[in-house]
């Protein structure tokens, strides 16, 4: 078994799917760790091509020899809720002013998408987490 590579950094970014480029925030974050920025951008864009239009969080693990691996996460719940509700952004005063409504079916669908990243045992618990996010954004769940 080959020796394990030593991890020197963990970078978390949220980038538009298929649109990573060396400009900030990607370039500076990777540059500090000496990662080949273009190599990452090409790999990320290829991996997220099918999900264009979504913001996809990524965790990049940087090793001592400047190589890297990355793990893609599911899109943020807030972005999925905004898309489902059809509004550009959440409420400035979430508990006073409501900006939109989503159905429990939509919340369940988002929970299905996010299940692997959520700390929930079943789909009902995951749906409650998503409903809480909706509430804090001024979106009513019916």
From Swiss-Prot:
Which residues span the membrane?
A: none
Which InterPro entries does the entry link to?
Ribosomal_uL11, Ribosomal_uL11_bac-typ, Ribosomal_uL11_C, Ribosomal_uL11_C_sf, Ribosomal_uL11_CS, Ribosomal_uL11_N, Ribosomal_uL11_N_sf
The record's disulfide annotation reads none
Which terms does the record give in the GO molecular function aspect? large ribosomal subunit rRNA binding; structural constituent of ribosome
Supply the alphabetized keyword list: Methylation, Ribonucleoprotein, Ribosomal protein, RNA-binding, rRNA-binding
By sequence similarity, the record places it as follows:
Belongs to the universal ribosomal protein uL11 family.
- The protein's name is Large ribosomal subunit protein uL11
Q: Which organism is it from?
A: Mycolicibacterium vanbaalenii (strain DSM 7251 / JCM 13017 / BCRC 16820 / KCTC 9966 / NRRL B-24157 / PYR-1) (Mycobacterium vanbaalenii)
Q: What is the lineage of its organism?
A: Bacteria, Bacillati, Actinomycetota, Actinomycetes, Mycobacteriales
